[in-house]
Amino acid sequence: MKTKLNELLEFPCPFTYKVMGIAQPELVDQVVEVVQRHAPGDYSPQVKPSSKGNYHSVSITITATHIEQVETLYEELGKIDIVRMVL
């Protein structure tokens, strides 16, 4: 039996997204812009470069209020052109 994400979370709760994208200066700004649309707040994302420096990992934590917000953000973050993966 599959456990669904909304069965594991009790809202509101902190929820961290890890966004991997091409190492371009605008990556962090684009991630924060999308997050602000769905979960307004004051964010200080953590950025880590890949070993070769071609990609950056941006970790950002929101206070999620419902499962639809979590799912929408996964979808919207994945639509950013320079993003390769959202975890």
UniProtKB/Swiss-Prot annotation:
GO cellular component annotations of the record: cytosol
Pfam families xref list: DUF493
Domain of life: Bacteria
Transmembrane segments: none
Similarity comment: Belongs to the UPF0250 family.
Name listed for the protein in its UniProt record: UPF0250 protein SG0794
